[in-house]
């Protein structure tokens, strides 16, 4: 399949046969056809720009030499795949020069040429900061240059003709990535602890973070954890609990430092990605994971080829076990709990499993939810007049978000490649809307309704749409499903055509799938041909009860089966 892609208009001028074979091999094992096209269009020599990845590596001096050698091979492989590395050394009173020497060896072993810069920033007499990436890019952001910048965390002050090590690494990195700098497509933070921890995943790393949505909550949670650890308070005044704090003081101190780094990593990601293109991606993982030779398991290589995490963040089978009690450190009680497989409570996370220690981050997209049961002219824009209501009664405030009906219809039309009968559709859903989720500027949308009997209704995903050019990118689908599962944690149903190529993705996010063509009630011959399958998601408690209740199942299936599509000229399809 990939050979046909290369043969028809997607040129990739590789310097040698081994690198071409590498690309073919990796694409065959890790990427979809769409991802392959996206990768080739971005990272080919014909794309007209040089793509860089910015590395920020903590405690490199603590990493075993064998791991460093493997990491050097990964750096070389990233370069062959079209991503040029750039390194920034974290500030440290004692280890900056050691880290510089180690990076020099890593770059040299990768057959590249290290280019050392002592000052990353220059502070002008006017107080403005100028980045070495902008001032000195002529040395490394050109043609087939093999020069790789290694930047120390120093600032040169023009007014005093002196230099100093930065004390604010977040501000340093923020200024470093401003101005006319080379195109940075990836920002990688490597350390010994891995990605941002999630209490719901037994302190394994979050899979994906949409910073626009989650930064405030996560930074607050991390700060709260740090505050809790700083107090060194025993669980009670019991003598054993007080002794526990004393005996484990070194462990607590180490954990406190680790959480400080996690918070700093989160803030670094937000500042750096804010200065880069909207498509730029951040990734936090361990040096050990980043050094893995397997292209399927190496989070850096995999993200380069697919622009996503090693696994999806919206898989509902990956959840905390029922009845599991949170530890005092699990402060993330407002984030999705179904991101990854739970482990035994006493089982330590394996640092060798890249899935458990890797977080992918995007600056992300803004999200709006419209919890209006009925659409009116007061909560929407462009609503057909037949759905206008009397001005009597309560109106939403002027600050309440209004749904743009024209954009609402446009994204559905584009995503499904057919025209929505707007009047028929609004007539069907009005009065029973559960919520409408809108991603960005109507780049993704989900319309959920209440179906079934009034006394025993259920939540139904009526429409799920993403703009065609964004399908598979930015994690929009995962973001929408995460929000749905969080907003309606008990159960959600949806249907899909039997031949829909997305059904495998739907299947992974459901706990049951039923064919709507089956006879729902043999005694009364309730059988109709249907081109749809029913997908059911529910937490274990609800799912166990609903899937064993034949009457409830019949209500699910009959209600969903008998919904008439609201496409123009297709209302008789079922």
From Swiss-Prot:
Activity regulation description: Feedback inhibition by L-arginine.
Start and end residues of each N-acetyltransferase domain: 392-560
Highest taxon of the lineage: Eukaryota
Gene Ontology biological process terms in this record: L-arginine biosynthetic process; ornithine biosynthetic process
Pfam families recorded: NAT
Protein's cellular compartments: Mitochondrion
GO MF term list: L-glutamate N-acetyltransferase activity
EC number: 2.3.1.1
Keywords for this protein: Acyltransferase, Amino-acid biosynthesis, Mitochondrion, Transferase, Transit peptide
GO cellular component: mitochondrial matrix
Gene3D superfamilies reported for this sequence: 3.40.630.30
Pathway connected to this protein: Amino-acid biosynthesis; L-arginine biosynthesis; N(2)-acetyl-L-ornithine from L-glutamate: step 1/4
Transit peptide limits: 1-13
The keyword Transferase is annotated on this UniProt entry: yes
Record PROSITE patterns: GNAT_NAGS
Catalytic activity: L-glutamate + acetyl-CoA = N-acetyl-L-glutamate + CoA + H(+)
InterPro entries the UniProt entry points to: GlcNAc_Synth_fun, Vertebrate-like_GNAT_dom
Chain's role: N-acetylglutamate synthase involved in arginine biosynthesis.
Family, similarity comment: Belongs to the acetyltransferase family.
Subunit comment: Interacts with the acetylglutamate kinase chain of AGR5,6.
Protein name: Amino-acid acetyltransferase, mitochondrial
Lineage: Eukaryota, Fungi, Dikarya, Ascomycota, Saccharomycotina
Protein's gene: ARG2
């Amino acid at each position: 399949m990939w050979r046909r892609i290369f043969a028809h208009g997607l040129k990739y001028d590789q310097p040698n046969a081994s690198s071409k074979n590498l690309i073919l091999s990796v694409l065959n094992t890790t990427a979809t056809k769409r991802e392959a096209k996206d990768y080739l269009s971005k990272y080919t020599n014909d794309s007209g720009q040089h793509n860089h990845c910015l590395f920020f590596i903590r405690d490199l001096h603590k990493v075993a030499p064998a791991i460093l050698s493997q990491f050097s091979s990964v750096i070389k492989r990233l370069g062959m795949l079209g991503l040029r590395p750039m390194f920034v050394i974290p500030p440290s009173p004692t280890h900056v020069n050691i880290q510089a020497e180690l990076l020099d060896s890593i770059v040299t072993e990768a057959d590249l040429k290290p280019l050392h810069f002592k000052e990353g920033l220059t502070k002008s007499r006017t107080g403005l900061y100028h980045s070495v990436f902008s001032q000195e890019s002529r040395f490394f952001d050109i043609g087939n240059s093999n020069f790789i910048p290694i930047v120390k965390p120093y600032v040169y002050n023009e007014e005093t003709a002196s230099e100093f090590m930065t004390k604010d690494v977040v501000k340093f990195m923020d200024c470093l990535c401003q101005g006319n700098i080379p195109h940075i497509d990836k920002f990688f933070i490597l350390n010994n602890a891995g990605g941002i921890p999630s209490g719901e995943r037994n302190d394994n790393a979050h899979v994906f973070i949409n910073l626009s949505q989650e930064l405030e909550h996560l930074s607050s949670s991390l700060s709260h954890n740090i505050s809790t650890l700083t107090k060194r308070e025993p669980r009670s005044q019991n003598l054993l609990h007080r002794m526990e704090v004393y005996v484990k003081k070194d462990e607590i101190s180490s954990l406190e430092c680790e959480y400080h780094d996690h918070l700093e990593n989160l803030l670094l990601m937000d500042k750096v990605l804010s200065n880069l293109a909207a498509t730029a991606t951040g990734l936090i993982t361990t040096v050990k994971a980043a050094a893995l030779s397997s292209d399927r398991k190496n989070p850096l290589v995999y993200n380069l080829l697919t622009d996503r995490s090693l696994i999806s963040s919206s898989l509902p089978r990956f959840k905390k076990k029922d009845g599991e009690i949170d530890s005092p450190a699990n402060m993330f009680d407002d984030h999705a709990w179904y991101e990854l497989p739970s482990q035994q409570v006493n089982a330590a996370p394996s640092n060798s499993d890249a899935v458990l220690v890797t977080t992918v981050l995007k600056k992300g997209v803004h999200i709006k939810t419209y919890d209006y049961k009925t659409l009116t002219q007061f909560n929407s824009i462009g609503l057909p007049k037949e759905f206008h209501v009397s001005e009597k009664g309560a109106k939403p405030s002027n600050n309440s978000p209004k749904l743009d009906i024209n954009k609402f219809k446009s994204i559905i039309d584009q995503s499904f490649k057919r025209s929505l009968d707007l009047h028929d559709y609004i007539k069907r859903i009005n009065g029973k809307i559960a919520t409408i989720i809108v991603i960005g500027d109507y780049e993704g949308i989900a319309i959920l309704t209440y179906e079934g009997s009034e006394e025993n209704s259920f939540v139904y995903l009526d429409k799920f749409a993403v703009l065609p050019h964004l399908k598979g990118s930015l994690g929009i689908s995962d973001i929408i499903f995460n929000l749905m599962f969080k907003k309606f944690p008990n159960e959600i149903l949806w249907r899909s055509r039997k031949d829909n190529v997305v059904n495998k993705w739907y299947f992974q996010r459901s706990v049951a799938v039923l064919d709507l063509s089956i006879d729902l009630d043999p005694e009364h011959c309730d059988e109709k041909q249907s081109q749809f399958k029913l997908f059911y998601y529910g937490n274990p408690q609800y799912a166990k009860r609903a899937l064993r209740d034949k009457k409830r199942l019949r209500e699910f299936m009959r209600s969903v089966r008998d919904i008439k599509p609201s496409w123009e000229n297709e209302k008789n399809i079922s």
